Amino acid sequence: MAWVQIRLNSTDKQAEQISDFLEEIGAVSVTFMDSQDTPIFEPLPGETRLWGNTDVVGLFDAETDMKAIVEALIASRLVEADFAHKIEQIEDKDWEREWMDNFHPMQFGKRLWICPSWREVPDSNAVNVMLDPGLAFGTGTHPTTALCLQWLDSLDLTGKTVIDFGCGSGILAIAALKLGAKQAIGIDIDPQAILASGNNAEANGVADRLQLFLAKDQPQDLQADVVVANILAGPLKELAPNIITLVKPQGDLGLSGILATQAESVCEAYAPDFNLDSVVEKEEWCRITGVKK
């Protein structure tokens, strides 16, 4: 049986309302997808957690009049009259197998691979991090994640301490440990991030070298040789005084989660304390790195 789907972008606050409405007008299923590869974690009891930038995907029978669906969405006032959307025909498939087949081991830099658990590692002599894409893991396909992983791979982390500020699923901290760091420290505002990072570290055999702190419990005198923060430009600027103090003198700093158009303002917040490298861009995103003065 064939299907037709509509995909539209929404905020986390409106996604559920749009989902309910699509089901009311005939959708056989509605799913939420992250549009920016941002980690999201298991909800607390009674809570639904969504990405701040969420794609809503409604699946309909192939005979459905999708023009009428679009008109109904506009009439509902849940979307703007000129809302961006994509409609496409979908063949009937083994969706679980299709989903698994879409995730392949990915290489970042010269040494580092991120591999889903159901795949054989391409190079047993490489640095392999085993992480499954899902609710608690950004897949690594987003440019900001890739930029940070490539940067970590380029460093000599042997014997060093690394802080992953805004650790999410712990992918950067775990990668740093696998790349030779002596110790890693993950910091996040979300308790679910701390739990996810711990579980992923356990699965990769590095939990004994990873310390995890909620931001409010971060030790006052905490410092590291390397600090990486893949969050957003706003928090990177607002939290610059805190992030700067985390880096030891002559230590390395890597920042991402930044649109290329935001790079200049983020650089201004860190330039007084760091000798900054040239900004590296990937698609519309960028990475800022430097060494503390």
Swiss-Prot record:
Family: Belongs to the methyltransferase superfamily. PrmA family.
Function field: Methylates ribosomal protein L11.
Subcellular location field: Cytoplasm
Source organism of the structure: Actinobacillus pleuropneumoniae serotype 3 (strain JL03)
Top-level EC class as recorded in UniProt: transferase
Catalysed reactions, as listed in the record: L-lysyl-[protein] + 3 S-adenosyl-L-methionine = N(6),N(6),N(6)-trimethyl-L-lysyl-[protein] + 3 S-adenosyl-L-homocysteine + 3 H(+)
Protein name: Ribosomal protein L11 methyltransferase
Enzyme Commission code: 2.1.1.-
Binding-site residues, S-adenosyl-L-methionine: T145, G166, D188, N230
Keywords associated with the record: Cytoplasm, Methyltransferase, S-adenosyl-L-methionine, Transferase
A cellular-component GO term for this protein: cytosol
